[in-house]
Every structure is written in C-alpha cells, then in structure tokens.
Amino acid sequence: MKKLYFAVGSQDLYGDECLRQVAEDSRQMAEFLNEKLKDIAEVELVPTIINSESCIKTMRQASCDDECVGVITWMHTFSPAKMWIKGLQELRKPLLHLHTQANEKLPYDSIDMDFMNLNQSAHGDREYGFIVARLGIPHEVVAGYYKHDDVVAKIRQFASVAKAISYSKSLKVASFGNNMREVAVTDGDRVESQIKYGWECNYFALGDLVDIINAVTEAEIDAKMKEYTDKYTMKTDRIDSVREQAKYEIGLEKFLAANGIGAFADTFQDLHGLKQLPGIAAQNLMAKGIGFGPEGDYKISALSAVLMKMSEGKEGATGFIEDYTYDLTQGQELELASHMLEVPPAFAATKPEIDVLPLGIGGKEDPARLIFDGVTGDGIQVTMVDMGDHFRLICADIELV
C-alpha cells in the first residue's frame, strides 16, 4: 500500500508538555485522515519536526521510501521556517501544505496564552508557507478544518495525484513501430519525456510481439472468448476474426507483463505479421488500465496510463478518444469524436457488442471491435504536445451528449 507521510511542525520553545499534546493531536489527525484516504494511500505519522535535523531526516526518508508518494505538512504551533529549509531542499516527493487546526472552534470562555501558543496554526502556517514559496517548491495548499468534507475531498485529490506521479516515475512505454509517417503532433522527445515525467519509452520490434502472439494456444483463446461472451454481446458470426483479436490481446498482455510495461503505442502503417489492426485487444487492455496511443503517439499512451491511475476509485470513466469532425449548426455546435477502433468500453452506456466491420485504412483484414452507445455527462479532455522547448498540457471542459 502506498503511503503519505504526515509531518507536523513545532519547536522545543514551549516545553515537553506542549510537545506531548502536539504529538497526541497529530496522532488523532493522522488516524482520521488515514481512515478517509485508506482506499488511496495510508497516512503515516512521522515524529514531530522540532529542528532542522529532524526535518532533514524526515524529508530524506520520504524521498528514499519507494512506498511514500508524498508528504503532508502542517504547523501545530509556530515552527520557525529556517529550520525547514535544508529538509525541504532534500524532498523529491509531492508536497501538500495542510493549513488547518486541531480544534474547530475556539473556547472563548477559557482561552489563554497556553492555548494560543499550542494552537498557533494561523501564525505557524504563514511562516511555513512563506519559506516554501521562497524556496520555489511546487506544492499544493489545502485550507480549512481537516474534518470538513470539502477539505477531505481536496486532500484525497492530492493523494490521487501524488500516487499517479509516483506511478509516472516508473512507467515504461512500448512503441511498436514508429510515429505515423509525416504526422507532427504525435511525435515528441522521448529523452525529455523521461527527464520530465519518468516515462521510459523504448522501441520494440513488432516481430518479437508477433512471435508471442503466434505462440498463443487454442485453449488460451477459448478462455478469452469465454470472457468476451460473458461481458459482451456477440453480434457477428465471423468468429475466426474475433478469435484473432483474442489472440492479440493475450499476446500483448503477456509481452507487456513480461517487460513491466504499462502503456503502448502502435501505428497502422507498421503491423507486419498481423492480419488485423488491434481492435478489441486495445479496447480491453485500456479497460484494464493499460495506456494506449495510436499513430505512434507515445505521449498519449503514457498520459492516459497516468490519468487512469489517478482516477482509480472514482466514478466516471477515463480513456482514449480523438477529435474528428464538427457539426457547426449555429447554437448547437458539436464535435464528433471517434477513432478507427480503439475507443475503450469505459465510455459505454450500453452493453458493448462485438462486430466485424470493414476498415478502409491500413490494408488489413476486417477487424473485430467493440461497438456501443456512449455515455453522457460532463468531462475533461486532456492532451499533451511537444512544443520543442517544453511540453504543453491542454485541457478543455466538455459535455458528452
């Protein structure tokens, strides 16, 4: 289980009794957050940060712990921020500044300076926030009482993103063939992608994949066909074409698993040794969280894998689609999105049907694919392009109709 470190700031100026209370309040907060985030990551309380040495130790530990995907920080008392500098400079994991308080309400009838020194987040978090900004460290800020639903929702969002970033750092992408000939936007700098995002994108000979596909047994295909008929409606009588796709899915899954690969890209111009363009095979693998990019677009395959990891446990659907053509009726403008085959069943509003239909591109046999009515509702389209000196992430709010 991946985990988030919960690091609480204080100092030894206020004495042992104050620090004991800080530790107890921190324990209760960590237990509460752990319960609220347990489906995403475990929240692990680390010793209270009271000086530069303890900060350095904690941040180094977080950076070196493969199971730690991020750090949540909060200042219970005032915590002089110079003691955070060296530790934060060591941190290599996503950082959340939780600007909150152990108590929701003030005890107006009994409040005194002891209480105010102990519960000094309004002061301490500003000091801490200043030094994080001064250091130029990218981070998220969530403000509000930690038990409130809106605050919990934002912390959960950070946890999901941190988990996806961790996944991104170890993601391997397979390119079968190269970029579609003469196409610009699908291309990109693979070296820079690995530097920026951790994506290890390498070319693999299609022949190596074809060898694995051709070694798939009839018994394995029978089992995959049983899976298909359990999940989908068989609309075609061209069963041999469907069995061919089943063989592709089995072979692809074996190849990806053997090489620790979480995303792949192919192009219809380089499918030597395959009778069909992968249809159901690609659609089903996306349904299992494997990223896919057509026309050799390794960026989209990697990005979709990361977004699917980020969306785990959430309602809705995540998958690949491509912009195609417009309906420009005034006041009713629409865009029809599609692709040759590989729209994933995550977007299905109806039970998908398996059919075999002609495909007028690629020069291959008619492929088997899943066909379904699409879902409706609000969504976000996301893409990534390489602008030469930087990557650009483009997002658009959309409505699926």
Which residue stretches match the model-derived regions?
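Metallocofactor- and cofactor-centric catalytic cores in central/energy metabolism, strongly enriched
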Residues: M1-A263
